[in-house]
């Protein structure tokens, strides 16, 4: 009786599975139902857990186990091994709490667990069990009843039996499935986030490299542009210095004498004035040079167009005369048709004279004039008013010419002029004539247009004779309107030879106003 009580109170833990047999259900106890072998129990839900003699060996059994594993994976949402692990964990946690399996069910759980871990029962390798070890004998008997059941079938039977004993297994597995799905979603989201961050990082890196390359290219282009501009500036500065040196060598004496007259005894002011005059002379020279280049280009283009239009219809002799008559010469920095030079196409009478007497001596090259301005217009006009002969009135529509013969002891002519309130046209010409009178004279004419109209009324023969007797005339400074009412206009020119300078004050464009001109001319050696 004592042995029976000890057995009834026995509670054994085998491989993590606790076995606590009840007195009512233990085999051999009074009032307990007879134990039936698990393999012959109908409707126990084990299916493939029967003895190996009832299974068909070979490929049919393997295919059946694989098919069962696929069905369970589809139903539970986990692979067979993962599902078995969840079921085993659920059994260990919930046994005796959420459900209370019977003694036979516990033996079945232990046997299936052993079948999964160790495979079929082998009496040669299993330790001996004592005669009084009731649980050990029951466990060995249950394990041996599984026969050659495969590991997969044992896991399937374990899950089925546990689900039959405790329906909460479905909720437990479902919660883990949801957790697994959430974890998978989080994993995918994290992977996508890392991928996006990596792509964004690569994109930003590429953009940064692109911006860096563009910046380097831009800096290189800017540096090249700055270098080119600096080289161009140095070249222009060097060219300017060369041109100014050449111009200053021509005008050094005139500017020095002019500055000495303006600021006698004040060397510093003289040097300042000379530098201003040299700079103005350079600017004027460059402006005239650009005008000459533009005029030459326009003349060449016009000549080319005329030759193309008229070349096909003119005979050979006419072509030669036309080409000779359209040649232009650059005199004093201005492009003009030299109608009175020995290089022009001669009139018939002049041609006969050249054949009989031979060609005339060629005229010397005329130097370019120097012109500048200075702002002391009020002091200049007050000084000029002291000499009444130095103030002339040019009436509306008139052209006043001041004739200044060259002086035997002089080599440069200087002029200065200003007006009261309005501008006036001004130009300088040189007449190749030996004037016996060295005094300055003033001549008034209505306008140059009237002279041209008078010349149109005479015949060609009379015009040719008149031109033959007329002295040669060269333009030094073309007639342009000057703002001499705002500042004093001054200039100088080197004598090209013996002759007469013609200073023209042109008011022919004014229909209503007369102009008062304050002027002064003098020569230097």
From Swiss-Prot:
Residues where Phosphoserine is found: 13, 20, 40
Gene Ontology biological process terms from the UniProt entry: steroid biosynthetic process
Alphabetic keyword roster: Acetylation, Coiled coil, Golgi apparatus, Lipid biosynthesis, Lipid metabolism, Membrane, Mitochondrion, Phosphoprotein, Steroid biosynthesis
Pfam families: ACBP (PF00887), GOLD_2 (PF13897)
Function recorded in the entry: Involved in the maintenance of Golgi structure by interacting with giantin, affecting protein transport between the endoplasmic reticulum and Golgi. Involved in hormone-induced steroid biosynthesis in testicular Leydig cells. Recruits PI4KB to the Golgi apparatus membrane; enhances the enzyme activity of PI4KB activity via its membrane recruitment thereby increasing the local concentration of the substrate in the vicinity of the kinase.
Lineage summary: Eukaryota, Metazoa, Chordata, Craniata, Vertebrata
Residues with N-acetylalanine modification: 2
Subcellular localization: Golgi apparatus membrane; Mitochondrion
Region described as Q domain: spans on this chain: 238-305
Natural source organism: Mus musculus
Name assigned to this protein: Golgi resident protein GCP60
UniProt keyword DNA repair present: no
Subunit structure: Homodimer. Interacts with the C-terminal cytoplasmic domain of giantin/GOLGB1. Interacts with PBR and PKA regulatory subunit RI-alpha. Does not interact with PKA regulatory subunit RI-beta nor PKA regulatory subunit RII-alpha. Interacts (via Q domain) with PI4KB (via N-terminus). Interacts (via Q domain) with TBC1D22A and TBC1D22B; interactions with PI4KB and with TBC1D22A and TBC1D22B are mutually exclusive. Interacts with C10ORF76 and RAB11B.
């Amino acid at each position: 009786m004592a042995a029976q009580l000890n057995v009834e109170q026995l509670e054994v833990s085998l491989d993590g599975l606790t076995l606590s047999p009840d007195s009512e259900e233990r085999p051999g106890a009074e009032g307990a139902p007879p134990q039936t072998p698990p393999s012959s129990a109908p409707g126990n839900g084990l299916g493939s857990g029967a003895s190996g003699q009832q299974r068909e060996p070979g490929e049919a059994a393997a295919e059946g186990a694989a098919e069962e594993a696929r069905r369970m994976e589809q139903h539970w949402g986990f692979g067979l091994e993962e599902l078995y692990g969840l079921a085993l964990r659920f059994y260990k946690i919930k046994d005796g709490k959420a459900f209370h399996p019977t003694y036979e069910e516990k033996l079945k759980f232990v046997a299936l667990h052993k079948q999964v871990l160790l495979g079929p029962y082998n009496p040669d390798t299993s330790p001996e069990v004592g005669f009084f070890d009731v649980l050990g004998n029951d466990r060995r008997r249950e394990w041996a009843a599984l026969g050659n059941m495969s590991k997969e079938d044992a896991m399937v039977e374990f899950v089925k039996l546990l689900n039959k004993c405790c329906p909460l297994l479905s909720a437990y597995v479902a919660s883990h499935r949801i957790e697994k799905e959430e974890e998978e979603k989080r994993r995918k989201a994290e992977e996508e986030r890392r991928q996006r961050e990596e792509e964004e990082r690569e994109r930003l890196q590429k953009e940064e490299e692109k911006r860096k390359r563009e910046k380097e290219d831009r800096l290189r282009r800017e540096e090249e542009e700055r270098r080119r501009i600096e080289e161009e500036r140095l070249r222009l500065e060097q060219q300017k210095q060369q041109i100014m040196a050449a111009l200053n060598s021509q005008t050094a004496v005139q500017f020095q004498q002019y500055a000495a007259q303006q600021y006698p005894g004040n060397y510093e002011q003289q040097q300042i004035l000379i530098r201003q005059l040299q700079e103005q002379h350079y600017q004027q020279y460059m402006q005239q040079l650009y005008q000459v280049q533009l005029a030459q280009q326009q003349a060449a283009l016009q000549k080319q167009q005329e030759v193309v239009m008229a070349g096909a219809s003119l005979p050979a002799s006419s072509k030669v005369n036309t080409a000779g008559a359209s040649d232009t010469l650059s005199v004093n920095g201005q492009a003009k048709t030299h109608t009175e030079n020995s290089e022009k196409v001669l009139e018939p009478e002049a041609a006969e004279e050249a054949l009989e007497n031979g060609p005339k001596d060629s005229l010397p090259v005329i130097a370019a004039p120097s012109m500048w301005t200075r702002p002391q217009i009020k002091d200049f006009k007050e000084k000029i008013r002291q000499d009444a002969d130095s103030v002339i009135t040019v009436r509306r529509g008139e052209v006043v010419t001041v004739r200044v013969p060259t002086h035997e002891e002089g080599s440069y002519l200087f002029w200065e002029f200003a007006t009261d309130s309005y501008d006036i046209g001004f130009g300088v010409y040189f007449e190749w004539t030996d004037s016996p009178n060295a005094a300055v004279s003033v001549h008034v004419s209505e306008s140059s247009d009237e002279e041209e109209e008078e010349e149109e009324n005479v015949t060609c023969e009379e015009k040719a004779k008149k031109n033959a007797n007329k002295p040669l005339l060269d333009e030094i400074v073309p007639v342009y309107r000057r703002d001499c009412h705002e500042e004093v206009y001054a200039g100088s020119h080197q004598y090209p030879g013996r002759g007469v300078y013609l200073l023209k004050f042109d008011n022919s464009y004014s229909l209503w106003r007369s102009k008062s001109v304050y002027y002064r001319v003098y020569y230097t050696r």
